[in-house]
């Protein structure tokens, strides 16, 4: 039985199939994303969506879709699908779908009378290019395929309407055409491996709707330009390959390119393989370095997200080299930012006060998953520089107080991951002593002391670090641990924030925590009772009057709700670490059971990946960006930890059996 396979009954039921999406990317930030039935449901959906650095740092939809029609005996059967109003779809091509399988490459099987046609899509790894392979498996009469391209040429976060500014010119190229609708955009080359007949038939297709945008309370209607169509005859057993790219290609090489790309694919035949594929889709390489995208389809590179997702998206899938290259790029960018105050060209939010703390944590994961000696050799100097820069006040909006704690000002501008704001002002004004900042700070100082512990020349400095850690730890307990047994989320002077939030799971789950085992267990119990869901930890306890579990409504309503209840899978990574620290090997079966909730998502939302957030209440519907790096990365980390713990348990049981 296939791991990711959907049958006719599901595919023709649009209530079930339309919410399911698929994503494929390359290493330049380009992507292909749509619903599994091929009907675009977001403005960010498209067959070929690419970054255009000369214009901005966002993606742009060139080719929105390609509608295929099967022609026999003069009758045309259109396989496309677009929405034009509430429950109004045309041309209803989904009714011909018999199966969708995306274990290796997304594959649709259509049946039109006696015709069986398969459609396989491959997004090229290192080029802004997609190949679609059509194979006529069965036919009893002469058959022709017609292809009608729907063009957008717009920012992926905007919409286009009929206008007279478009360039209607068509340039004929080998087995296809090239066109460019607006100045500043690259030409779109659409070619086939066989000779194709092009027919000029220019039309605006007006009033196409994207229902997921409508639900989000944002503009959702647009007009798309269709300049004409291609026609090619096809015989039983024959294959036609379509290529869409920003450069002219040799049609004779299409089959070879397709086959070579297929060899590089890891089949999505398991939970782990799905997440491994999802992780690699976040890799981004450009002239400035190598990065991890925060998520698709609308996020770019964001500092905190990159660091939280990095260990899982590289080390947990044995991509150590990518870890080093990405980390080296980040360290270089952060050094430049701290030295000059200039924002980075690629990494957004690199100047937030907790970035150095998360960077140290990301380095620490290399020691955890790979090797302490190599970690020491590669990164000890960087960790030392970061700790000393913090101690000397070199990080903007991060002040070290005499009590050893770090202070940040967040009343006017959000400084933490709970960053929702209205009118530029934070909804949750976390300011003063912020819980995870200081937990990460204690962890960082202890980690540096550990890295330098074997160095005789650093013995005095290590003693100084350990003394500082003692001061931080004592102040942390006095400041954050309350009489109820959990941790204040932030403390600002005499004000203590009593809301039960998941940042305390971070404090418990870190390798070095100022909390003793009894304190950790009490805090963990609060997380389990009030925050834990099958899709991660809630951002706020349901007992709070501010609790808003469902992330729906217009942009303002969603902004108010985003950090007031919806659950995040990435926080489960810290929760599982905390659980193992409290319960050891006896906690293994519980964490394994909890992972089932994430595996269930492999056939929901964005197939094979994890959404940005999930409703805090059942049925825990996925919301936000369809695929996010820190969620995928942290669940991969948990899987790796579970595998390590399983080996320890097996070894322990084996040793006991020989006694």
Regions inferred by a protein language model and the residue ranges of each:
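Aromatic-rich carbohydrate-recognition surfaces in CAZymes
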Residues: 138-139, 160-163, 234-236, 300, ...
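Terminal accessory carbohydrate-recognition/targeting modules of carbohydrate-active enzymes
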Residues: 1-267, 297, 319, 331, ...
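Extended, well-ordered alpha-helical scaffold segments
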Residues: 146, 256-267, 271-275, 318-332, ...
């Amino acid at each position: 039985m296939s791991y990711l396979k959907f049958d006719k009954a599901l595919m023709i039921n649009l209530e079930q199939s339309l919410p399911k999406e698929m994503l494929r990317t390359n290493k330049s930030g380009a992507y292909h994303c749509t619903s599994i039935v091929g009907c675009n449901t977001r403005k960010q959906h498209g067959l070929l969506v690419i970054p255009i650095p000369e214009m901005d740092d966002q993606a742009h939809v060139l080719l929105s879709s390609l509608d295929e029609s099967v022609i026999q005996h003069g009758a045309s059967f259109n396989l496309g699908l677009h929405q034009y109003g509430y429950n109004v779809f045309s041309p209803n091509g989904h009714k011909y779908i018999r199966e969708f399988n995306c274990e290796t490459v997304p594959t649709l099987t259509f049946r039109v009378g006696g015709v069986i046609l398969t459609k396989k899509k491959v997004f090229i790894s290192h080029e802004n290019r997609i190949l679609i392979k059509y194979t006529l498996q069965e036919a009893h009469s002469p058959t022709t395929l017609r292809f009608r391209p729907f063009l957008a040429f717009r920012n992926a976060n905007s919409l286009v309407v009929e206008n007279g500014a478009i360039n209607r010119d068509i340039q004929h190229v080998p087995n296809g055409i090239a066109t460019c609708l607006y100045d500043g955009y690259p030409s779109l080359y659409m070619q086939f491996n066989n000779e194709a007949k092009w027919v000029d038939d220019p039309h605006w297709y007006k009033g196409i709707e994207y229902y997921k945008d409508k639900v989000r309370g944002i503009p959702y209607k647009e007009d798309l330009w269709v300049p004409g169509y291609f026609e090619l005859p096809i015989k039983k057993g024959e294959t036609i390959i379509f290529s869409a790219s920003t450069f002219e290609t040799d049609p004779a090489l299409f089959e070879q390119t397709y086959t070579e790309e297929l060899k590089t694919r890891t089949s999505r035949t398991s939970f782990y393989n799905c997440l491994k594929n999802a992780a690699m889709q976040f890799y981004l390489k450009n002239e400035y370095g190598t990065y991890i995208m925060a998520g698709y389809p609308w996020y770019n590179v964001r500092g905190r997200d990159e660091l939280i997702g990095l260990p899982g998206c590289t080390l947990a899938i044995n991509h150590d080299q990518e870890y080093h290259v990405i980390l080296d790029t980040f360290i270089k960018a952060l050094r430049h930012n701290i030295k000059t105050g200039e924002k980075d060209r690629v990494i957004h939010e690199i100047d937030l006060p907790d970035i150095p703390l998360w960077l140290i944590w990301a380095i620490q994961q290399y020691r955890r998953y790979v090797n302490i000696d190599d970690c020491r050799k590669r990164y000890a100097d960087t960790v030392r520089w970061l700790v000393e820069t913090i101690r000397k006040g070199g990080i903007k909006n991060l002040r070290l107080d005499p009590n050893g704690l770090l202070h940040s000002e967040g009343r006017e501008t959000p400084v933490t991951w709970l960053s929702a704001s209205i009118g530029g002002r934070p909804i949750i004004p976390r300011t003063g002593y912020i819980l995870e900042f200081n937990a990460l700070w204690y962890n960082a100082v202890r980690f540096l002391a550990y890295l330098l512990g074997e160095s005789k020349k650093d013995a005095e400095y290590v003693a100084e670090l350990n003394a500082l850690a003692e001061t931080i730890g004592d102040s942390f307990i006095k400041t954050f641990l309350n009489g109820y047994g959990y941790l204040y989320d932030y403390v600002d002077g005499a004000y203590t924030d009593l809301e039960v939030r998941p940042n305390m799971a971070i404090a418990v789950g870190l390798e070095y925590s100022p909390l003793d085992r009894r304190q950790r267990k009490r805090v963990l119990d609060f997380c389990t009772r009030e925050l834990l869901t099958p899709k991660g930890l809630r951002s706020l306890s349901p007992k709070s009057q501010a609790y808003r579990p469902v992330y729906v409504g217009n942009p303002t309503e969603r902004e108010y709700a985003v950090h007031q209840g919806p659950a995040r899978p990435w926080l489960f990574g810290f929760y599982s670490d905390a659980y193992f620290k409290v319960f050891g090997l006896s906690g293994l079966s519980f964490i394994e059971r909890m992972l089932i909730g994430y595996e269930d998502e492999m056939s929901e939302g964005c197939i094979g990946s994890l959404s940005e957030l999930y409703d805090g209440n059942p049925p825990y519907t996925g919301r936000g960006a369809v695929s996010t790096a820190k969620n995928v990365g942290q669940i991969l980390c948990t899987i790796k930890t579970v595998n390590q713990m399983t080996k320890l348990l097996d070894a322990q049981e084996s040793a006991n059996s020989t006694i």
